[in-house]
Structures are given as structure tokens and as C-alpha cells.
């Protein structure tokens, strides 16, 4: 269809593999949480690691960074992965003690959008519509919710025997609003960097953040938690002596509005 556009801001790069008998206790002291999904922040700017259980013994580990970080390193994919995780000693030791059961795989240029989300006789859902970043599995949320929301317009289109673009207007409006919220949230996440952990653990904001992460972003109402995140970023940015100032990420976006 020729609708795909590369995201002008997010230029992330991921290297990942599967490991057998990785000791998940290295990520938490709580035995009830060893099989949770974990995110590990790394010292390298805008870089983090995912830890996702696949089976009882196999774990997916992936390093996500800005493409320029990898390019500047001059390292192979394998070496970059190990150099990155080496900055988290407990994670590195646990990985080295496990068995890598899949070769490293790279993912690049995966942040994109579409000029339109629907047209005569077609609707784009999930990754076919938009993908920003793998953080918090937002792509899974968009896929499930876009399919759910599209089904209403599709059923009505079949009932009315009208498959013109206008029949999918409600879907397009809701999805664009939801994607806008995800985009803004992910941008703020990278700017807050490691400070996001302090924010999400604050009881004043925790429930609102969890609702957002569960996909409650499509209603059309302004999400107050995003305004709170903006306030914190602005406060820290404006004060070079702020205790948190040196921990801010360097991803700057003039506007949180997606370009498409």
C-alpha cells in the first residue's frame, strides 16, 4: 500500500537471544516474582534489558539501545550484548552461568507508522498499523485493543454492506488517540530514564500508571498521569543542581504528537 513511514524520533536497536536455566532469582529477592517480566536499566543512555520468561526454564533476554550507540561501539552484535549486560553484574553472572539456546538476533528500524489506518475495504490493526518500541509490551496492547475496537466497525460494515473508509472512522479516531498516548508515554519514559522506577512506585501515581500499561488509553480523555510525568521532567530539567538531573535520559522530542 506504500503507507509505511519510519518514525523520525525513535531509532532503537535490539539484540536478543534465549537462555536455558537462567537463574531468575538474580532479578528479585521475592520468590513469588521470579517468573515476572523484568526491565533492567543500564548506564548507557536510552538503553535497557528485557527479561521475559518463555517456559519454566527458558528466558528471553534482549538489549535495547539507540542505533547510534551500537554503531559508535564498533562491536559485533554478540560483543555489544555482552558488554551491555556486563554493566549489571548480577544479570551478567546469571547469564554466563546459563546456556544460550538460540543465536543472537537483531531487530532494527522497527519504529514506524502508517499514513492512514483504514480505507475502502481495509483496516490496519496491531503491528500493521503502528509500532513504537517494545517497552512494556505496548505492541501487544495495541494489537489486542485495535482488533477489539475494529471488530465493532467491521460488524457494522458487514451489516450495512458498506465498506467505505467512513465506516471505520470511529476505529481510526480511537486508535490514533491511543497511539498518541502510548507515544507520549514512551517518550517520557525514555526522558525519565531510571527515574521512572521512582515515579511508578510512588503511591500517588502507581495506579494511574498501571491503568495506562493495561491499555486504558483509548477513551479520548486526557491522561492526567502524563501531565504529572511532564511536570516531574520539567522540574528536574530546569534545575541543574537537582539530585535527579544527571539521571535524565537525553531523548528530546519537540512535541509528543506522532508525525503520522
Residues covered by each model-derived region:
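FAD-dependent flavoprotein oxygenase/oxidase catalytic domain
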Residues: 56-57, 65-68, 90-93, 99, ...
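C-terminal helical "tail/cap" subdomain of flavin- and related membrane-associated enzymes
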Residues: 152-260
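FAD/FMN-dependent oxidoreductases across multiple families
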Residues: 69-153, 159-170, 177
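A structural signal for alpha-helix termini and helix-coil/disorder junctions
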Residues: 3, 21, 25, 87-94, ...
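Tryptophan-centric aromatic hotspots in well-structured domains and transmembrane helices
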Residues: 15-19, 48-51, 110, 122, ...
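Predominantly flavin-linked oxidoreductase catalytic cores and closely associated redox partners
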Residues: 1-92
